[in-house]
Amino acid sequence: METQRLRIAMQKSGRLSQDSQALFKSCGLKINLREQRLIAHVENMPIDILRVRDDDIPGLVMEGVVDLGIIGENVLEEVQLIRASQGQPFAVKTLKQLDFGGCRLSLAVPDDVTYTGPQSLAGKRIATSYPGLLKRFFDEKGLSFKSVMLGGSVEVAPRAGLADAICDLVSTGATLEANGLKEVEVIYRSKAVLVQAPNPLSDAKQKIIDTLLPRIQGMQQARESKYIMLHAPKDKLDAITDLLPGAERPTIMQLAGETNQVALHVVSSETLFWETMEQLKALGASSILVLPIEKMME
């Protein structure tokens, strides 16, 4: 009999693992992920968390071994391209792009090499762990190159004489700089995504997903929003409201003992910069507070 516990695969270590754990916690899942176990059970919901290698997650989701997976778009796209080149079917459903795991896949060359565009690497040796994405980029340019497949430490390839350039994930660029390389072109930008198995799930599992998705959406909206409170003169309300970025219609309340002053409360979907606060003050606003929001649900 098929278990009715929802199975979610996540990366077993690294930054994406830490961000996934934080997401589970913020969604109210009680789970002990400190012990090095393959499967961890959520205490307050019928969910099991599987911790695996990131490049195993797309296959586990597609084959229905797990119901959901948290994976970088770069890994997902690479697996899809490689399978397509081998004539193997691949289908998963992306439920939501998440607000973490951001990175970019970039070309990099030695510092002393002049780069004038992708054509300057035509016919050159390029080391990478993402041959599918790299080939697609050069195919779209109508250019050929020699792929040097490396599973790790791609950045040392030019210095070791294995390649003329590299194509690797970049976050700060510090690793490239330490190896005498410079980033010259971004070929793919990626974030983490929540993906689902292609086949329909049971009603019980779908109900769990329908509970999780609004929580994830609420957490992401909360991180992107601020709660703003201020006092404002009545005759300046329109001008003050126009200054609040991405704001919905505000809540207006009469201040006790004040006939010309009101309290204004609003959720803003954008950052309120110091310059905006100074403009609000210049219009007569006072007691301006900008507060973080922990959770939201529309």
Curated annotation (Swiss-Prot):
SUPFAM superfamilies: GlnB-like, Periplasmic binding protein-like II. This is ATP phosphoribosyltransferase. Catalyzes the condensation of ATP and 5-phosphoribose 1-diphosphate to form N'-(5'-phosphoribosyl)-ATP (PR-ATP). Has a crucial role in the pathway because the rate of histidine biosynthesis seems to be controlled primarily by regulation of HisG enzymatic activity. Its cofactor is Mg(2+). PANTHER family: ATP PHOSPHORIBOSYLTRANSFERASE (PTHR21403:SF8), ATP PHOSPHORIBOSYLTRANSFERASE ATP-PRTASE (PTHR21403). It is found in: Cytoplasm. Feedback inhibited by histidine. It catalyses: 1-(5-phospho-beta-D-ribosyl)-ATP + diphosphate = 5-phospho-alpha-D-ribose 1-diphosphate + ATP. It is an enzyme of class 2 (transferase). GO terms for molecular function: ATP binding; ATP phosphoribosyltransferase activity; magnesium ion binding. GO terms for cellular component: cytoplasm. Belongs to the ATP phosphoribosyltransferase family. Long subfamily. Pathway: Amino-acid biosynthesis; L-histidine biosynthesis; L-histidine from 5-phospho-alpha-D-ribose 1-diphosphate: step 1/9. Its EC number is 2.4.2.17. It holds the Pfam family HisG. The gene is hisG. GO terms for biological process: L-histidine biosynthetic process. It comes from Aeromonas hydrophila subsp. hydrophila (strain ATCC 7966 / DSM 30187 / BCRC 13018 / CCUG 14551 / JCM 1027 / KCTC 2358 / NCIMB 9240 / NCTC 8049). Keywords: Amino-acid biosynthesis, ATP-binding, Cytoplasm, Glycosyltransferase, Histidine biosynthesis, Magnesium, Metal-binding, Nucleotide-binding, Transferase. InterPro entries: ATP-PRT_HisG_long (IPR020621), ATP_PRibTrfase_cat (IPR013820), ATP_PRibTrfase_CS (IPR018198), ATP_PRibTrfase_HisG (IPR001348), HisG_C (IPR013115), N-reg_PII-like_a/b (IPR011322), N-reg_PII/ATP_PRibTrfase_C (IPR015867).
